[in-house]
Amino acid sequence: MSKDIYYSDKYYDEQFEYRHVVLPKELVKMVPKTHLMTEAEWRSIGVQQSRGWIHYMIHKPEPHILLFRRPKTD
């Protein structure tokens, strides 16, 4: 199922590195509606990315799109 997960390219501002992840419809029901996911939670539904990414925002009109960020390291 994780083969159907889409990972955006990374994009940046002065402070953070960002990316969004688009889930297939069958995984949307596993996304909590009440809170942002911990790393353990997003990994448990099949999202695979390096450590340090934070699920930082819920975009209610599109719950299948997960928004992540992490501090820039350069």
From Swiss-Prot:
Highest taxon in the source lineage: Eukaryota
Pfam (any one): CKS
Recorded GO CC terms: cyclin-dependent protein kinase holoenzyme complex; SCF ubiquitin ligase complex
Keywords for this protein: Cell cycle, Cell division
UniProt keyword Cell division present: yes
A GO term for molecular function: cyclin-dependent protein serine/threonine kinase activator activity
Single biological process term from Gene Ontology: female meiosis I
UniProt similarity note: Belongs to the CKS family.
Function as written in the Swiss-Prot or TrEMBL entry: Binds to the catalytic subunit of the cyclin dependent kinases Cdk1 and Cdk2, and is essential for their biological function.
Assembly with partners or alone: Forms a homohexamer that can probably bind six kinase subunits.
Protein name per Swiss-Prot or TrEMBL: Cyclin-dependent kinases regulatory subunit
UniProt source species: Drosophila melanogaster (Fruit fly)
